[in-house]
Amino acid sequence: MMPLTAAREFMRLLTGRFLATRCPQVAGSLAFTTLLAIVPLLTVIIALFSNFPAFSRLGESLRTFLLENLLPDRAGQIIATYAFQFSQQAAGLTLIGTVLLVLTALMLLMTIDHVFNHIWGVRRPRPLLTRLMVHWFALTLGPLALGGSVLATGHLVATSIALAGEGSWVGATFARLVPTVLLGSLFSVLYYAVPNHPVRMLHALAGGIAAAIVFVLMQRLFGLFIVRIPTYTLIYGTFAVLPIFLVWLYLSWVVILLGAALSATLPSFFERARILRAFPGDRAWAAVTMLIALADAQHAGTTLPFATLQAGARVSSNEGEALLGEMRDAGWVAHTEEGNWLLSRQAAQIGLAAVVNRFALSPAAWREASDGDEASRRIAERLATALHSADLPLSALTSAGNRVQTG
């Protein structure tokens, strides 16, 4: 019963995150963006391989891998063939045209970056210059790394088949598994490196492997659907290539985003036993707990890692990131270059009332919501008075402050 309950809880968390971040709608947007950016992406990749003849075999291996494993039969391969032809003709573009192509490719990568950060609940992405540099390296070095991996595994498969024999089931099974493993590795790298959020390698691998398996199954089912139910071909004729390819892109992005949501959900799922049960004012309690820990660290002249703050406040990693992000917006905390956290002002300058006002009960918001109602206005004033009377500086709540009061 317990494993079934845990599985049900995990599916609830996964479905909640997948829908809350609007992944089905975002997948549609990414499908159209990919359709627009596919030629610019291929242009940059082909230019990279053509300018370095030593990498020509890598380029050919990458092209074969894309056609055989990432695209549906017929429609995808027709689109890819035209895209490769257009990309090769792009060599005659002017400087402005080339810049526009590169910018279009970078825009797709930046859109993916934004979507992944949203799934992980990241409030602040990397600085723009850092993102551009990361995306440029991904655009230039990524195809080389993927092409090298495909070429190396191709040699490995050929060697395995030669050792096991031409008709051996071992070689055939290995040849079928390798593309799935490569896809899983590619997705895992995406889930690990793209979000501006600490992601455990094990969680990224789990999401990547799950997405790769679902992707391969979806590819087979999609191929069977197109062959057995040729509705698009009957209605659109030759033009059926485009809607079929768009549907394929949409389903592909749904699978990729589902894998990302799975990777982002795993920490919350494993932390659920340590997370404090929800109660009125729980966010204010967690924020005060974090601030007191940071005030103690400030007194000791140290900083604290996120894991320590999260464990002390007994919140999920996503909620902890959100709380710290809001406190950073308020000017109370700051993020160090090493990845730790510290108070950005003296503990005596942060009041308990300000924290409660931001995370639990805001008299100002109550007053604004009253819409001129006299009773609501009077209640808001009394709440503000009560908060002011109960206010304490954060320094009075720290270990050092408690010792002073006790003494």
Swiss-Prot record:
It is found in: Cell inner membrane. The keyword Cell inner membrane applies. The chain crosses the membrane at residues 29-49, 92-112, 132-152, 174-194, 207-227, 239-259. Keywords: Cell inner membrane, Cell membrane, Membrane, Transmembrane, Transmembrane helix. One of its GO terms (cellular component) is plasma membrane. It is a multi-pass membrane protein. Its main location: membrane. InterPro entries: UPF0761_bac, Virul_fac_BrkB. Belongs to the UPF0761 family. This is UPF0761 membrane protein AZOSEA40600. It comes from Aromatoleum aromaticum (strain DSM 19018 / LMG 30748 / EbN1) (Azoarcus sp. (strain EbN1)).
